[in-house]
Amino acid sequence: MFIDTARIYIKAGDGGNGIISFRREKYVAYGGPDGGDGGKGGDVIFIADPNLSTLLDFKYRKKYIAQNGENGRGKNQYGKNGEDLYIKVPVGTLIINDETGEIIADLVKPNQKAIVLRGGKGGRGNAKFATPTLKTPRFAESGEKGKEMWVRLELKLLADVGLIGFPNAGKSTLLASCTRAKPKIANYPFTTLTPNLGVVEHKGKSFVMADIPGLIEGAHRGEGLGHDFLRHIERTKMLIHVVDVSASEGRDPIEDFEKINEELKLYSERLLTLSQIVAANKIDIQSGKENFPAFEKEIKKRGYEVYPISALTKVGIDKLLDKTIEILSSIPVEEIKEVPEVIVYTPPEEEETLNIEVKDNTYYLSGTKIDKLLKRVNLQDEHSLRYFEMLLRKSGVIDALKEKGFKSGDTINVRDFEFEYYE
């Protein structure tokens, strides 16, 4: 089954907690603090696997969580770092922030990596807080929580030539005639519901051809799976527009041609700048032979070259492929942009806020600034509370409180925990 979009939840590992510990050794009366730091949480890393061709795995599993770091230990032992989580995706996968729509990474190279979420830092053990004036700190930091987010994955096929046209125009048959690909072929609307790829080898040259599923009017708005199909055209170098010139489906070949190009234009005008040649298919049918002269005349008026073919009997295929190779050879090679082996994504920082509300001489603190400070302390522990007070001073919160009339001895309330602050 071919799946080219997915939405998944990812979370980096939490940092391990620092530990409170004191050296206990025979003949050492005052060993001092020896609590070790917690380990770092595991990162979430995407890797482009050349052996994958679909996002099918993500249909059955939606949550991916990296390993947490281990807590620190006594004797100044650090906790073990959490293992990084590697998520394999096909080459050509876009990773998008589902909330903002921001493109995080475009993995276009085999084995290319994207570090999307960094694991939380480990908390510091009490040994790190020992000072000449605080020789036996009885508190430690909690580990930092790993970041989390929902991401959208979109697979865009990497092909040189895209086959476009209405359903049943003969694209799958043409792909099968030119390559060893074996797409399912039948005479039903939307016969091909997934793109198929094949390698064309012709007169010593080779290129990748993609059969883009049949489009309908309104495809640019997403109708008839339109967005899913049009996405795959974006990376192609040129297009072969397959038209059923026999009108076997009861449609007018000229109108078919115009409608498909209109859909391309409405989706992205850049698609119309791609080189495009027209394959007038089903020329082996009597109505195809009769319709071809008028069709060719109209298409040439629009500036396109037309090649009469029969994808079924392979009539005219050689000339079509000759022209395709000629065009591909003439397309200037894009200046190769250096593709980084590893992409490191930095999520947008949450805007820092500090809210102060005063009621009955009690100062209520809230906001992202306070949340960040609280993540690494335990207010129920007296020593940790003293450390929190120091953080309030260093971060400028106490100065902000003083601007509101706060003075030494007043009460501070944080998440319903109240304490008196003295300088």
Curated annotation (Swiss-Prot):
Domain (Obg) ranges: 1-158
Keywords, ordered alphabetically: Cytoplasm, GTP-binding, Hydrolase, Magnesium, Metal-binding, Nucleotide-binding
EC number: 3.6.5.-
Named cofactor requirement(s): Mg(2+)
Gene3D superfamilies: GTP-binding protein OBG, C-terminal domain, GTP1/OBG domain, P-loop containing nucleotide triphosphate hydrolases
Residue ranges constituting the OCT domain according to the UniProt record: 346-423
GO biological process, one term: ribosome biogenesis
Cellular component, GO, one term: cytoplasm
Locations listed in the record: Cytoplasm
Binding residue positions for Mg(2+): S172, T192
Top-level enzyme category: hydrolase
Annotated PROSITE patterns: G_OBG (PS51710), GTP1_OBG (PS00905), OBG (PS51883), OCT (PS51881)
GO molecular function ontology, one term from the record: magnesium ion binding
Binding annotation for GTP: 165-172, 190-194, 211-214, 281-284, 310-312
Presence of the UniProt keyword Hydrolase in the record: yes
Record has Nucleotide-binding as a keyword: yes
UniProt xrefs under NCBIfam families: Obg_CgtA (TIGR02729), Obg_CgtA_exten (TIGR03595), PRK12296.1 (NF008954), PRK12297.1 (NF008955), PRK12299.1 (NF008956), small_GTP (TIGR00231)
Complexes and interactors: Monomer.
Similarity comment text for this entry: Belongs to the TRAFAC class OBG-HflX-like GTPase superfamily. OBG GTPase family.
Functional summary from the UniProt entry: An essential GTPase which binds GTP, GDP and possibly (p)ppGpp with moderate affinity, with high nucleotide exchange rates and a fairly low GTP hydrolysis rate. Plays a role in control of the cell cycle, stress response, ribosome biogenesis and in those bacteria that undergo differentiation, in morphogenesis control.
Protein's UniProt name: GTPase Obg
Organism of this sequence: Thermoanaerobacter pseudethanolicus (strain ATCC 33223 / 39E)
Lineage: Bacteria, Bacillati, Bacillota, Clostridia, Thermoanaerobacterales
Gene name tied to this protein: obg
